[in-house]
Amino acid sequence: MKRIVLGIMLCLSLSVIAVYAQEKTETKPAPPVTNAEAAPKAGQVAPEFTLANDEGKQVSLKQFRGKWVVLYFYPKDFTSGCTLEARNFKRDSAHYEKANAVILGVSTDSVDSHKSFCEKEGLNFKLLADTDKKVSEMYGSKMEYNGNIYSARNTFLIGPDGKIAKVFMQVKPMTHSEEVLAAIAELSKK
């Protein structure tokens, strides 16, 4: 009888160990894959593009020559990090205006999604719909995650001359707006 009880206990112990080991080795989603190596560098002329904004109107980068352009790419409307980043740009918008800067947000979301996001958050700058993902790719901000394509969280500060003045890769939404404002202030001194 003791042997049977010991045998059962051994089997149960091995089963628990096997389940625990399986949980430990389950695969986690792969990290996002980006084409960041293709991103234009500081000093280069910013690649030109035209995209529809949150109102469905066509917006071209060249429209903003003579101004600083904060071209920020972000993954998805209505997500926590993207909402925080947009709110901080909105909060600081008077400082950007004073610095002769415009803010343009770009993601792979649709015009309708951008419109809803702008309305819900009361955004006072334009969001551009890169639905074919070509601009994200051109700026090294195309990201694949779990089989979907998004824009990676990168920002290109474009000078009034149309050249990229500074590149911010994989930014932190909480402090990014202040970081960009500081860069504009520093670069404006030169």
Language model: regions and residue ranges:
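N-terminal targeting signals for export/organelle localization
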Residues: 1-48, 190
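A short beta-strand-turn-helix
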Residues: 40-43, 49-68
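Residue-level recognition of short loop/turn positions
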Residues: 55-56, 132, 161
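Short active-site neighborhood of thiol/selenol oxidoreductases, capturing the structured segment around
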Residues: 61-83
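Structural microenvironment flanking redox-active thiols in thiol-disulfide oxidoreductases
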Residues: 83-123, 133-138
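Thiol-/selenol-based redox modules, centered on thioredoxin-like
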Residues: 151-190
